[in-house]
Amino acid sequence: MDVPIHVIRYFCVLAEELHFGRAAERLSITPPSLSQQISRLEQQLDVKLFDRSPRKVELTSYGRALLPLARRVQDDHDQLLSWGRSV
C-alpha cells in the first residue's frame, strides 16, 4: 500500500478543520477533490476515518487513532525536506 504524503496532509488538515470547504481552501484544492482523496484513503486503509453529514464532519475512532501517526509522518517528511535543503 502506498499513501502519498499529500494525502496524509489532506487528512491532517481536514481533521483540524472538520469542514471540507475550509480544509480545501487551506490546501488550495476543491472540496470535491479533497473528498475524493479522503475516500480513497479510507478505501486503502479499509476503515472510515470521518463521519460525514450535511452539517458537520467528525473524526471516527479510527480517524482519532490515525491522526497522531499521520502528524508524525508529516513532521518527519518536513524534517527530511529541510535536511535535504541544508546539505
Predicted regions and their residues:
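Alpha-helical linker/hinge and terminal dimerization helices associated
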Residues: 44-45, 66-87
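N-terminal short secondary-structure element
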Residues: 1-37, 53, 66
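A short LG(V/I)-centered, amphipathic sequence patch enriched
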Residues: 42-59
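Short, conserved clusters of charged catalytic residues that mark active-site
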Residues: 6, 58, 79
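Short, structured secondary-structure boundary patches
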Residues: 38, 54-56, 71-74
